[in-house]
Amino acid sequence: MSRLTLLVLLVIAAVIQKVHGQGRENEKKNEHEPGNQDGGNQNEKTERNLREPNRQTRRFNTRNDNRNRNIMQKRAMLLWQRRMNQRSNQNNFGNNRSIPPTNTFNRNRSRTKSNKSEVEKENGSNKASKGKMQSGDGGGNGSEKEGPERRKVQHRIAKRFQKRHPSNSPKPKPARKTTNQQYRRHFMNNYNNKYWNWRRNMLNRRRTSPQHYQNQQARWRYYRYGPYTWYRYKNKWRLVRYNNMYRRNIKTNQSKKSNQNNQGD
């Protein structure tokens, strides 16, 4: 009797379990639907956030920060470079020559403003505005005489009034120095020259910090564009300003031990 009751109880338990399990399956099947409030997977959101970044998402997360940093860096370097070019343009050599569209831009410009009365201007006797001579009383040089139109000839300004070097044209380069001239006191290959020996030592020294930066002229100019620091990348020194220092992409540690709050560096 006892065996029979045990068997019946077991069968009943199995049936109940099966039915209950089916109900759970149905509940699970519907858990993602909008009407279902309970039975949803509570960890779904955090799982989505902890997903291992693939190539595309990693690129997307990193891109904006790097772009911002690069733009700032380029802008500061360009400002500094433009200043350097302004300084070195007076010695026109190398790639620093600025060649304007024309040499003779300021040459024949009228140097005095016309202080004529309005009556004269109404009569058209302001000669600077007239490109051609006109017959009759129209104005220009030949306004008294009647006759065919003649081209207005503009003579060169007297040489002593001329600018030798108009501001926009490059100065002529002097001829190359002869051999005995170029080994003068300050020339680089003159080994008695303290300045160049110091610089040569600098260039040959293995630099692990940017303490002595070669370009002396540049040294004091970097500071104008905000606080900065040098860092070594691909065996070259690069410049980063402090306002960009904290904008780097966050390193995520994928191990199970890491916290959700890990902010990288």
Curated annotation (Swiss-Prot):
GO CC entries: extracellular region
Protein localization: Secreted
What does UniProt give as the signal peptide span?
Answer: 1-21
Residue ranges, compositional bias (Basic and acidic residues):
22-35, 44-55, 115-124
Protein name in the entry: Asparagine-rich protein
Q: Between which residues do disulfide bridges form?
A: none
Decide whether keyword Transcription is in the record: no
Q: Which organism is it from?
A: Pinctada maxima (Silver-lipped pearl oyster)
Q: Which residues does the annotated region (Disordered) include?
A: 20-71, 88-183
Where this protein primarily resides, as one coarse class? Answer: secreted
Q: In which tissues is it expressed?
A: Nacreous layer of shell (at protein level). Expressed primarily in the mantle with highest level in the mantle pallium and lower level in the mantle edge.
Q: Which UniProt keywords apply?
A: Secreted, Signal
Comp. bias regions, Basic residues:
152-166
Query: Where do Low complexity bias regions lie?
Result: 88-98
